[in-house]
Amino acid sequence: MPVAAATALAEAGIQAQEVSGSFVFETAAGKAVRTSKPDALTRDCATLRVNASDFPVGDYTVRFALATRDGGSKGSAETLFHRVAKLPERKAFIDAHRRLIVDGKPFFPLGMYWSGVKEPELETYAKGPFNCLMPYGSPDKQQMDACHARGLKVIYSIKDFYSGTHWAPAGMKTEADELAEIKKRVELFGNHPALLAWYTNDEMPLNMADRLAARQRLMEELDPDHPTWAVLYQYDQVRAYLSTFDVIGTDPYPIPEKPAGAALLWTRTTRDQTYNTRAVWQVPQVFDWGAYRKGAERDKTRAPTLQEMRSMAWQCVAAGANGLVFYSFFDLFKMKDRDPFEKRWADVCAMAEEVKRLIPVLLSAEPAPSVTCEGSASVETRVWRSGSDVYLLAVNGTSEAVTATVVVAGGFKSVRAEFGNVPERKGDGHLVYTFAPLEPVMVRLSE
């Protein structure tokens, strides 16, 4: 079992060698049963790996304390874990590979944000490549049934149920009101076959962290069968929210004012902010900012092109995303005066269909060879094994042509492209890429 604690030595002007740290494991009764030095202590993280089977079944607090060499305290942090004799069966949970498992099978959420569920639009959506949706308007039973009938899962929004916040329902004035409404939703839909996850946080500020953490604990108690998903624009503050979610997403919407490579930067940072221990379902842009602007400001916007949407989706996957929920389906209708829905929908489906085709690969947990990338920092790689084949994704996250060399440990016999330009083979295990701007390339390597 890996244990990690965030440190802020760099911000404090302290070097790692100037301090020491220790992890203490305590029972629910407060008895310390183990004290361990970290396996590694760096400027921003202390890590330890322990054998959980050494601990009797029960609840534990893990506390990390940081001190100077002379014994002066530099702070502490703690978390909880529950040691079980056997992992309980869950309808939906996140496994050790950060994949969502639904009814015992890996599931890659491929969906879009909705406003409210409307059956005529649902009919159109169900014919596309998507397997889930996240409607802001929390669905009723009839709408949940309609989604299930079409083979669609629902990420159910309870993100507004915080009294005193902007979008809280008018009658929600107290914590008791929040609890009553959440219990009601869990009772109504916790066992519904369409339910995939609970959407608990949509870009809430950091000063809400304590309330968000309490909400996470509540959802773990009320419905341990489904994970929670939070989405932030504060991509470089994710670490401060770690106690508030099971799954995290961030939502880079760069087009047209910023480079499409923001998708790569945000996903890399999101992954690293979680110590690469949490599932990441990213929220790439498919909408036109003009849907939210007027007059001259609206005229300055445009929708992302098919090339940009493809690149941003694969940038997210390459940097570690195990789910994609695009923003947004409902905005595709708002710009029909200059971008007909039919054309935009066709482009969105073409992009998502490419991801859907490779979902069996993206969900593989078979041990894959390590790869190293030499060249532009704008290139991200990720590798999977599926049977006797190795799949290597490499994405150029910049709007310029770049080159990079990827070295595959153990080498390979042949290479062919699933999409993108086939890289040049040069030496044992070496692939030399000449990327077009924003180009994603997926190759299949045979050993």
Where in this protein do the model-derived segments appear?
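Aromatic-lined substrate-binding rim segments of carbohydrate-active enzymes
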Residues: E119-R185, N207-P227, A260-A263
